[in-house]
Amino acid sequence: MVRKPGSMYRNVRQRSFTRRKYMGGVPGSQVIHYDMGDKANTTFPVKISLVAEEKCQIRHTALEAARITANRHLVADAGKMGFYMKLRVYPHEVLRENKQATGAGADRVSSGMRRAFGKNVGTAARVNSMQKLFTVAVEKQNFPAAKKALWHAGQKLPTPVRIVIDEGAELVQ
């Protein structure tokens, strides 16, 4: 079956569905690393964060795409040990889909909306308004590279985002 568009799962419409103890066959998260860069040195002078402006659900595939993009830009511009990046949300929410048969004779095979609870197809992170998604710590000279990397990561996410300076604002002004 074809993967459904992320816009189907973006809005928070129902209560949380996270109790894996009662579910069979929850697909694993594609997000592998939550800490990247120089993990031994997390005390860089400038810290900036990517903040979600709206409440939404972000699929694990979108989180992984944003993480890869930001990490690639940071490694290219600041070097492997010139930054520390942390992904601050985890995809706990289990997403379901009621599969529909299509094509000739589908009405004989499909049960329509009868028993329409759906099967587990993926996971998502529930994000509140103004919640931090990514945090990057860098040296003063790598601030523009970190800002560019977070902007590119924000393009992969289903919500409007903003970049906020957490620490070291006086160093970069």
Swiss-Prot record:
| PANTHER family tied to this protein | 60S RIBOSOMAL PROTEIN L10
Quick check: keyword tRNA-binding in the entry?
no
Question: Mind giving the lineage of the organism this protein is from?
Answer: Archaea, Methanobacteriati, Methanobacteriota, Stenosarchaea group, Methanomicrobia
Provide the GO biological process annotations. Answer: translation
Gene3D superfamilies linked: Ribosomal protein L10e/L16 (3.90.1170.10)
Asked if the record carries the keyword Manganese, the reply is: no
Q: Which family, according to the similarity comment?
A: Belongs to the universal ribosomal protein uL16 family.
Q: What is this protein's gene name?
A: rpl10e
Q: Which GO terms describe its cellular component?
A: ribonucleoprotein complex; ribosome
- Listed NCBIfam families: PRK04199.1-3, PRK04199.1-4
CDD domains, per this entry?
Answer: Ribosomal_L16_L10e
- Which named protein is this? Large ribosomal subunit protein uL16
Q: What SUPFAM superfamilies does the record point to?
A: Ribosomal protein L16p/L10e
MF GO annotations: structural constituent of ribosome
Organism of provenance: Methanosarcina mazei (strain ATCC BAA-159 / DSM 3647 / Goe1 / Go1 / JCM 11833 / OCM 88) (Methanosarcina frisia)
Q: Which UniProt keywords apply?
A: Ribonucleoprotein, Ribosomal protein
